[in-house]
Amino acid sequence: MFALPQAGDRRGEIIKVLLSNGWDYMNGLLTLGKVGEPQIPTPEVLTKILVELGPFYIKLGQLLSTRPDLLPPRYINALTALQSNVPPLPWSAIEDLLQREFPQPLGETFQEIESEPIAAGSIGQIHRAVLQSGETVAIKVKRPGIDVIVEQDSLLIKDVAELLALTEFGQNYDIVKLADEFTQTVKAELNFDTEAAYTNNLRTNLAKTTWFDPNQLVIPKVYWELTNQKFLVLEWLDGVPILTADLTQPPSDKDIAEKKKEITTLLFRAFFQQLYVDGFFHADPHPGNIFYLADGRLALIDCGMVGRLDPRTRQLLTEMLLAIVDLDAKRCAQLTVELSESVGRVNFQRLEVDYERMLRKYYDLSLSEFNFSEVVYEFLRIARVNKLKVPACLGLYAKCLANLEGAG
């Protein structure tokens, strides 16, 4: 056996958190290199550990919540609710950062910047500001030092993955590749140029739609000349999260039920286009990221997490949903194998039986009674228990559907 290479104070901090929460398996792995089949603590303890370990691990947990092909439902549910409790940085630190590193001189760019953030997270915080032109904008500022922390934690995750690769679990799930995917995704979120590009792509795609009235759905405009890796400046949208919105405003001749139906239809059409036409979608449309604007339009915000579906995957997913509606267990099993990234020896009979059991609950339901996010999560669970590796994009696809059902 061998132990992990030293990683300075950060490694010691991690071991202290693991010891205080009683995760003996991971503590043994980090200190002595003891390799055995992974033993995961309860969902509650795992989320507590991730929060205490800080921004990188919070993001890691949020990414794991999109992978029901890797973890059982109770872990997915706990990780989905994972939120950072990071206090905002004081205005003095933000102001100093803006003065030193903002792309343009502050006095020439802004009339004012509000010192109190409107939101703060593990990677950055957002301040409202007014440009010299009179336009109101949102400035997202990256936390100083976050890059160094993420780089250190990424190296530790890589070392842990190389140890876990010696286990059956690690081999079944190609754990080294998986760890690399996760760390690259977190690092991408640190680059606000990337989020700006995602935002702009969604805005462009949805502006030219024929599936709905593009004037009714807003994606914030990016101010490219004021945006770089550390700062993201977006159009300010005056609204509130959809679930707290007063749908009687602005006044109209439509009642609440009609407005709710219009909103549901608009969201369905917007995401149908993203998922099945464009293959590029906002992967985190929870109710807090769908705003009801003062003028009655909808807006999608926080476009930092996106998913991609290639044409073949989109076609297979469509066929899978049709097979489930038709209660065709054999076809579901065939499509699961086709969607898998790599297939060793598959017990096809067992796979088909798993689908027969799953489909029983849908025998007497009409199409309108189907919970399609639950259906996709079931499909990913079946893939997991049959040791079939599916593309990571399918986890984001399932998360997107689940969030939409929560918003609607």
From Swiss-Prot:
GO terms for molecular function: ATP binding; protein kinase activity. It comes from the Bacteria. Signal peptide: none annotated. Belongs to the protein kinase superfamily. ADCK protein kinase family. This is Uncharacterized protein slr0889. It comes from Synechocystis sp. (strain ATCC 27184 / PCC 6803 / Kazusa).
